[in-house]
């Protein structure tokens, strides 16, 4: 607001004029040439600007949840995956009676376009669904050899929310169903760039290796000094069952011919142990029958007694005189000491009288 000046005799307020600045005052002060040391100090003390200057374009959101009946190890694995994936969301456990296609509605309500669903059966078998909701495709795996972060206690470590590198085995590019799984894993597990909850650093790597017709997952820390890898965890193995065209259902695109269900595996192991038990019982029965059989007597071999020498016969001596009894020295000493004590007692009693 401009400055005003009031007249002395009650007149109206008049706007005061600002004093004019000279041309010399208008000029900025002359800058002193900074030395190299001052420039270095300014650079050192300067606060760097924000690292993330880009725009968040990849809006991938992953829903990670499970069915009822999971054990503690599955729950810890689910928490580890949520920690490693800042673009994930959680939800309550789904009831076993609900059909799997209901998960597409849950994803739509949570505004998620990808889903990792853990399905527990018989409180000992764990299945994992990877799905692109709502149009598919989706893949079903049997999860084996689970080791969580708290269980492993590895020396590796990474920043929470940092973006990972994804390393795939060359075998993923050889077969079409592995190529489809590779693209699905890339879209689900890779953290979007410039995500609000992510950190602009790359300090760990997810490795996917194919061995024995299974996918082995490992998480390693990248050390800055020599680019060495130190395992962080968790670790698990995915045994592929089927790939479906739709999300949680639809036509089957691929079925693993090498897959053996856990029920069949337990049945085979039980049959092997039963066969071993039956074999042991048969051996015992044969041994009992052999013991009951009469022993076959071999004919006497006359040549067996060729080198047998008869022992010398000692003459039999008959003792006619009764042997003298042995003297018991201890009993004899006791009797002597007993006599001496009695003699002393008599002498002492005579003196007192």
UniProtKB/Swiss-Prot annotation:
Position of the Glycyl lysine isopeptide (Lys-Gly) (interchain with G-Cter in SUMO2) cross-link: 160, 314, 322
One BP annotation, GO: rRNA processing
GO CC field: nucleolus
A GO term, aspect molecular function: rRNA binding
Biased composition (Basic and acidic residues): 22-36
InterPro entries, alphabetized: Brix (IPR007109), BRX1 (IPR026532)
Residue ranges annotated for the Brix domain, each copy included: 60-249
Pfam family, one: Brix
List of residues that carry Phosphoserine: 261
Compositionally biased spans, kind Basic residues: 1-10
Keywords from the UniProt entry: Acetylation, Isopeptide bond, Nucleus, Phosphoprotein, Ribosome biogenesis, Ubl conjugation
Family in the record: Belongs to the BRX1 family.
Subcellular location, record wording: Nucleus, Nucleolus
Annotated spans, Disordered: 1-46
Keyword Cytoplasm: no
Modified residues (N6-acetyllysine): 276
Function statement: Required for biogenesis of the 60S ribosomal subunit.
Protein name: Ribosome biogenesis protein BRX1 homolog
């Amino acid at each position: 607001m401009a400055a005003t000046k009031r007249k002395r005799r009650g007149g109206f307020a008049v706007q005061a004029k600002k004093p004019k600045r000279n041309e010399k005052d208008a000029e900025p002060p002359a800058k002193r040439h900074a030395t190299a040391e001052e420039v270095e100090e300014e650079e050192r003390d300067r606060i760097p600007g924000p690292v993330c200057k880009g725009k968040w374009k990849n809006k991938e959101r992953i829903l990670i949840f499970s069915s009822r009946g999971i054990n503690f190890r599955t729950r810890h694995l689910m928490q580890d995956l949520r920690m490693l994936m800042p673009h994930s969301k959680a939800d309550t456990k789904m009831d076993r009676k609900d059909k799997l296609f209901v998960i597409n509605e849950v994803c739509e309500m949570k505004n998620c376009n990808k889903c990792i669903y853990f399905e527990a059966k018989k409180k000992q078998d764990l299945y994992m669904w990877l799905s692109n909701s709502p149009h598919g495709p989706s893949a079903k795996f049997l999860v084996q050899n689970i080791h969580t972060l708290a269980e492993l206690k590895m020396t590796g470590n990474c920043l929470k929310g940092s973006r990972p590198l994804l390393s795939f085995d060359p075998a993923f590019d050889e077969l079409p169903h592995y190529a489809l799984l590779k693209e699905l894993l890339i879209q689900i597990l890779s953290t979007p760039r410039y995500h609000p909850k992510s950190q602009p650093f790359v300090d760990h790597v997810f490795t996917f290796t194919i061995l024995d017709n299974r996918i082995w997952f490992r998480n390693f820390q990248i050390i800055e000094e020599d680019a060495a890898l130190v395992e962080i965890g968790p670790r698990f193995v995915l045994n592929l069952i089927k790939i479906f065209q739709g999300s949680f259902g639809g036509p089957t695109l691929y079925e693993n011919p090498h897959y053996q269900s856990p029920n069949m595996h337990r049945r085979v192991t039980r049959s092997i142990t039963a066969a071993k038990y039956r074999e042991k019982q048969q051996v015992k029965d044969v041994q009992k029958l052999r013991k009951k059989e009469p022993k076959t007597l071999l004919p006497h071999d006359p040549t067996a007694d060729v080198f047998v020498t008869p022992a010398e016969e000692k003459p039999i001596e008959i003792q006619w005189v009764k042997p003298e009894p042995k003297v018991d020295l201890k009993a004899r000493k006791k009797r002597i000491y007993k006599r001496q004590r009695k003699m002393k007692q008599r002498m002492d009693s005579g003196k007192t009288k």
